């Protein structure tokens, strides 16, 4: 039977991608349905109990700047917060938080259940309704049919998921959850390229059986950071310490002696695993010269005794897992409460997607998260927000939107996926972005919140907070520009006392702030330059904008040059065999990737500058040279 109501957008899956997609579509005013196999696992942290990190924290800030959920949920659930790379430049500083799994899940569910325009329904999805190459609905396991104008697939590792522990394996979406077999088979019938990937998780350890007295604690930062631009530390629950231990030669010997029982090394697992989050057996073999690896013992929550040993993801048999754990300092008597495992699952080639994450072949069908070949909560959530937003726009007959590479890490992420695809689980790093100085955590709201407001994602409270911050920054910078001191000014001795070289000519506040020995806090304690802004976000922004102004201006010039290529569009139906002068290799790659623009074409491996020049000349001769707005 058909459900009596029609929806604008259906989201299939309630993980990090699905929950952000559902919230985005509903915030835009679209009638949204979130279909999940289990309402109790909405927002579940399936692997490590942490949010953020290098590159990943940047994505979380961008999600927040666009009105998303992840940062606010982390502020309500975070039990340890740290700023990584704190001693380095602002471009690579990143926030990371340990999170209480239960509190995080509760925060996500509360937000979903209180979001207008959003209905949640518990049923696995087994089929899509596709008519004339356009998706128009979904069918659940009990045969109930839902109609919608757009559908977003955020099914994580559930598509034909297979769990491996040693040489044994069984079907599963993750530990304790069934796989999605019928939906996987249905999707394989569509004109989409599909392959297999693998990821894994470590065994969980009972904290009561760990001798923490032997281990070094790792504490959070003071003052405690926050994730959301609207957050404050008073929202955080009680804070906890992590602890550090190490593998050793005994650990490595156990692993080497049992490689024949590893499903990965025995050839049972076909999917490719994540390069930047390898299993412990992979680390031991790939880095044979290392006699130890650092392992972080991360608490799973305030009310849980489970410890997540970050760094020993494994699919070795349970008896070997016990030997590995008990070979490490402090864990000699440890008990495992959940075994580690690897999971193989289907993913679909993201080169078959537009930058909006809509399928090139099935209208109204959007993909987000691990189904696109990514790994990580943050990457999934960012894609979910974008897919939900664009599904909402599609349902309203509006053009899709996607940020450029110079506008957001989200732009880098979707451009990498839709242009280059991936053969291994893709994770975000700051090194993937060409314009890191522009894409900092601290300015994510300055880059994206205004656009989020135009798109209908940003509510009045966030907009008022953002507008006030912008006003504070502009007024404070003007105030500093208007305050001048010269070598003979009254109180100049106090200023010279903190300068490496005394004033030799007149200078204003911004010129003093550009000096490496002066920061904003110090400047505003000097005569005439106080008082300081009370909003730490606005104060940080003033300092960064002033100190890096020259570098930022140069990077902006580079961006403007690149945009000329980025905005030169390529016809979607162009057969590159028509373009004389291109090599057979270039023709094959362009016909395979079908890039949207000259800029996108230039990032495809093997596409040379000479090939780009030939393309530009051909487009001009054919009268096809046009640029997007």
Curated annotation (Swiss-Prot):
GO BP: any one term: tRNA wobble uridine modification
Alphabetized InterPro entries for the sequence: FAD/NAD-bd_sf, GIDA_C_N, MnmG, MnmG-rel, MnmG-rel_CS, MnmG_C, MnmG_C_subdom, MnmG_C_subdom_sf
Annotated SMART domains: GIDA_assoc_3 (SM01228)
Superkingdom of source: Bacteria
Compartments, record wording: Cytoplasm
Binding site for FAD: 13-18, 125, 180, 370
Residues that coordinate or bind NAD(+): 273-287
GO MF, one example: flavin adenine dinucleotide binding
GO cellular component: cytosol
Record-linked Gene3D superfamilies: FAD/NAD(P)-binding domain (3.50.50.60), GidA associated domain, C-terminal subdomain (1.10.150.570), tRNA uridine 5-carboxymethylaminomethyl modification enzyme MnmG/GidA (1.10.10.1800)
Requisite cofactors: FAD
Swiss-Prot/TrEMBL keywords: Cytoplasm, FAD, Flavoprotein, NAD, tRNA processing
Entry similarity comment: Belongs to the MnmG family.
Oligomer status and interactors: Homodimer. Heterotetramer of two MnmE and two MnmG subunits.
Function: NAD-binding protein involved in the addition of a carboxymethylaminomethyl (cmnm) group at the wobble position (U34) of certain tRNAs, forming tRNA-cmnm(5)s(2)U34.
Protein's name according to its UniProt entry: tRNA uridine 5-carboxymethylaminomethyl modification enzyme MnmG
Record organism: Yersinia enterocolitica serotype O:8 / biotype 1B (strain NCTC 13174 / 8081)
């Amino acid at each position: 039977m058909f459900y009596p109501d029609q929806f604008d957008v259906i989201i299939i899956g309630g993980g990090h991608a699905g929950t952000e997609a559902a919230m985005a579509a509903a915030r835009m005013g679209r009638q949204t349905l979130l279909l999940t196999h289990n309402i109790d696992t909405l927002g579940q942290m399936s692997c490590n109990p942490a949010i953020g990190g290098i590159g990943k924290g940047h994505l979380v800030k961008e999600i927040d700047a666009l009105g998303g959920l992840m940062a606010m949920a982390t502020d309500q659930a975070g039990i340890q917060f740290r700023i990584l790379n704190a001693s380095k430049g602002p471009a690579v500083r990143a926030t990371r938080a340990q999170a209480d799994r239960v509190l995080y899940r509760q925060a996500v569910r509360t937000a979903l259940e209180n979001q207008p325009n959003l209905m949640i329904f518990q049923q696995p999805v087994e089929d899509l309704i596709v008519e004339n190459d356009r998706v128009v609905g979904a069918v659940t396991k009990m045969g109930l049919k839902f109609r919608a104008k757009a559908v977003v697939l955020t099914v994580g590792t559930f598509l034909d998921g297979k769990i491996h522990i040693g040489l044994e394996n069984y079907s599963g979406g993750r530990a304790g959850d069934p796989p999605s077999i019928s939906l996987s088979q249905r999707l394989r019938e569509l004109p989409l390229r599909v392959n297999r990937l693998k990821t894994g998780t470590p065994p969980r350890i009972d904290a009561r059986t760990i001798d923490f007295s032997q281990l070094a604690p790792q504490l959070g930062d003071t003052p405690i950071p926050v994730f959301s631009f609207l957050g404050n530390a008073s929202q955080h629950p009680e804070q906890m310490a992590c602890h550090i231990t190490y593998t050793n030669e005994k650990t490595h010997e156990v692993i080497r002696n049992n490689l024949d029982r590893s499903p990965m090394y025995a050839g049972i697992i076909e999917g490719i695993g994540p390069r930047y989050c390898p299993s412990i057996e992979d680390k031991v073999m790939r880095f044979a010269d290392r006699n130890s690896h650092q392992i972080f013992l991360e608490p799973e929550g305030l009310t849980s005794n489970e410890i997540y040993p970050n760094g020993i993801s494994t699919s070795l048999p349970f008896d070997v897992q016990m030997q590995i754990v008990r070979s490490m300092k402090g864990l000699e008597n440890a008990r495992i409460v959940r075994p580690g495992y690897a999971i193989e699952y289907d993913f679909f080639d993201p080169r078959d997607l537009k930058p909006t994450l809509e399928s090139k072949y099935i209208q109204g069908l959007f993909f987000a998260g691990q189904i696109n070949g990514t790994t990580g909560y943050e990457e999934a959530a960012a894609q979910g927000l974008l897919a939900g937003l664009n599904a909402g726009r599609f349902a309203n007959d509006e053009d899709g939107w996607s940020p450029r590479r110079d506008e957001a890490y989200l732009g880098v992420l979707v451009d990498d996926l839709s242009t280059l695809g991936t053969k291994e689980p893709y994770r975000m790093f700051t090194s993937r972005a060409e314009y890191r100085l522009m894409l900092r955590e601290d300015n994510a709201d300055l880059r994206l919140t205004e656009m989020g407001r135009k798109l209908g994602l940003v509510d009045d409270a966030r907009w008022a907070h953002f507008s006030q911050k912008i006003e504070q920054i502009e007024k404070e910078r003007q105030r500093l520009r208007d305050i001048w001191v010269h070598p003979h000014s009254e109180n100049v001795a106090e200023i010279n006392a903190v300068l490496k070289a005394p004033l030799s000519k007149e200078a204003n506040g911004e010129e003093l702030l550009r000096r490496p020995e002066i920061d904003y806090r110090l400047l505003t304690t000097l005569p005439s330059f106080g008082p300081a802004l009370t909003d730490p976000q606005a104060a940080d922004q003033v300092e960064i904008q002033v100190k890096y102004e020259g570098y930022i201006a140069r990077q902006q010039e580079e961006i403007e040059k690149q945009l000329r290529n980025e905005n030169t569009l390529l016809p979607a139906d162009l057969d590159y065999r028509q373009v004389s002068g291109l090599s057979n290799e270039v023709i094959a790659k362009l016909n395979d990737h079908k890039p949207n623009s000259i800029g996108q074409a230039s990032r495809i491996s093997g596409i040379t500058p000479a090939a780009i020049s030939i393309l530009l000349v051909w487009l001009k001769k054919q009268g096809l040279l046009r640029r997007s707005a």
